[in-house]
């Protein structure tokens, strides 16, 4: 019911040890979880955190304040630095893009137009450009495509009234596919 704080745990599975390590506690609605090769990103009502492991030591750094429901990490503007694409609040109605500059993330773009209960993120590459796909469960229940070009960020609708709960992008035999677990027939 999310009324109590949660925690982030790691388990040392070496030699079937199953040793539990508490990484963070007192995180409310720690629902967002995104993994890259370098880090794990955790969204919660306490903010957005980056978890790394170096020399068997966990490090947890707060990147953003405020209620962050979920996150996707992607170099969407193709400048060599990953942006943070977030859902403001858990299952919220605002998508924000943060760009890093001098070690600090700054909001560059917000999208709130007719979206409610934003639920799913996945990233992909189309025509040699990084893009992010977004599933919206209520309101217009669209599947959205976020992209960046010479004049900024753009959000386009790929599908309407389907309410994707999960999305997955894959390239097979040089063809791009977006899989969607929809709660409504299109």
PLM feature spans:
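Beta-propeller-forming repeat regions
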Residues: 1-186
């Amino acid at each position: 019911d999310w009324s109590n704080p949660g925690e982030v745990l790691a388990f040392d599975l070496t030699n079937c040890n199953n040793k539990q390590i508490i990484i963070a506690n007192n995180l409310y609605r720690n629902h967002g979880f995104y993994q890259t090769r370098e880090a794990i990103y955790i969204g919660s009502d306490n903010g957005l955190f980056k978890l790394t492991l170096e020399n068997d030591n966990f490090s947890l750094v707060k990147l953003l304040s405020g209620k962050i429901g979920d996150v996707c990490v992607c170099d969407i503007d193709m400048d060599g630095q990953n942006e943070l694409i977030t859902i403001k609040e858990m299952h919220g109605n605002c998508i924000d893009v943060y760009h890093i500059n001098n070690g600090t993330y700054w909001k560059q773009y917000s999208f709130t137009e007719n979206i409610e209960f934003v639920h799913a993120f996945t990233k992909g590459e189309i025509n040699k450009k990084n893009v992010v796909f977004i599933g919206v469960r209520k309101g217009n229940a669209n599947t959205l495509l976020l992209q960046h070009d010479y004049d900024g960020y753009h959000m386009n609708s790929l599908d309407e009234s389907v309410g994707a709960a999960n999305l997955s992008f894959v390239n097979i035999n040089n063809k791009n596919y977006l899989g969607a677990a929809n709660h409504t027939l299109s």
